[in-house]
């Protein structure tokens, strides 16, 4: 059972662990979404993992019990063509053929895809249709400015095709990025796209345990208790393990992890 912010403010994690942890009836399963094949090499190797590298790792990754395996965002289509001289769609097909029972994820970036231009609706729609046709059954979308107009069509179409969908809330530190902003954006995502789950996306590694104390309950209040909520962060400050512990205490359902390539 998730703690309220008031409970967290009066009971530290050290006190919880010293007492032997939570009572048995408060235990929850926290699921793991692996990002080794997508974000790990994107962040450390500039997305230079080749198809042969992925295929070598595939058995271990797909048999580890992860809820989903993150495989591509638009940059995983750009780099193979530009630098590796590989066909990214062929990579996607090979991976799905080798592990047909694994839920691989794809993510769509705003209205840009793999470019820096705003693309027309028919191009966005064709991209989403090709993702689904090539095996993806979990499709999400994000916009760096949390402009839901830029991702709503993607999520609606993906769901119409039969995919499980996730909408991202991009995290940032600024006077604008208040709890209320995330409440408003989460509600808009759910109301406009009927999304299947929400991801708090912290690509900059800026989340802290203290920030989670109000942010996660705020988002949860907006989306209800039944819609899965996941957190994606990076360990640039070294705080991500503790941030994830607080996320679990506060009611997050899934966390994103990876290993170095």
Give short role names for the model-derived ranges.
Residues 1-123:
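N-terminal capping/small domains of soluble enzymes
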Residues 31-39, 67-71, 102-109, 137-141, ...:
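Hydrophobic faces of well-ordered beta-strands that scaffold small-molecule active sites
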Residues 59-67, 125-137, 183-201, 246-255:
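Structural recognition of alpha->loop->beta junctions
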Residues 46, 150, 177-178, 207-211, ...:
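Secondary-structure boundary/capping motif
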Residues 58, 92, 128, 155, ...:
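Generic hydrophobic/aromatic pocket-lining and core-packing "Φ" positions
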Residues 100-102, 160-164, 191-196, 220-227, ...:
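Secondary-structure transition/capping motifs at alpha-helix termini
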Residues 203-261:
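Catalytic alpha/beta core domains of metabolic enzymes, predominantly
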Residues 73-188, 195, 205:
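Active-site beta->alpha loop and helix N-cap motifs at the rims of alpha/beta catalytic domains
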């Amino acid at each position: 059972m998730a703690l309220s912010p008031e409970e967290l403010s009066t009971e530290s994690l050290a006190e919880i662990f010293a007492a032997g942890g939570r009572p048995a009836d408060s235990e929850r399963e926290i699921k793991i979404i692996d990002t080794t094949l997508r974000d790990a090499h994107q962040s450390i190797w500039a997305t230079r993992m080749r198809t042969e590298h992925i295929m070598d790792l595939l058995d271990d990754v797909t048999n580890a019990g992860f809820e989903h395996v993150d495989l591509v965002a638009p940059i995983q289509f750009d780099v193979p063509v530009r630098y590796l001289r590989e066909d990214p769609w062929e990579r996607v097909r090979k991976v799905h053929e080798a592990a047909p029972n694994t839920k691989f994820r794809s993510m769509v970036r705003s209205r840009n895809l793999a470019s820096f231009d705003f693309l027309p609706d028919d191009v966005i729609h064709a991209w989403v249709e090709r993702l689904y046709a090539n095996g993806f059954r979990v499709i999400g979308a994000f916009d760096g400015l949390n402009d839901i107009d830029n991702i709503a069509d993607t999520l609606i179409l993906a769901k119409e095709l039969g995919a499980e969908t996730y909408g991202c809330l991009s995290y940032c530190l600024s006077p604008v990025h208040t709890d209320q902003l995330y409440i408003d954006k989460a509600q808009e995502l759910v109301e406009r796209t009927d999304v299947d789950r929400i991801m708090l996306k912290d690509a900059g590694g800026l989340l802290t345990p203290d920030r989670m104390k109000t942010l996660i309950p705020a988002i949860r209040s907006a989306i209800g208790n039944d819609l899965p909520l996941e957190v994606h962060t990076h360990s640039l400050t070294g705080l991500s393990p503790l941030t994830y512990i607080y996320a679990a205490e506060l009611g997050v359902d899934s966390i994103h992890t990876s290993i170095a390539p």
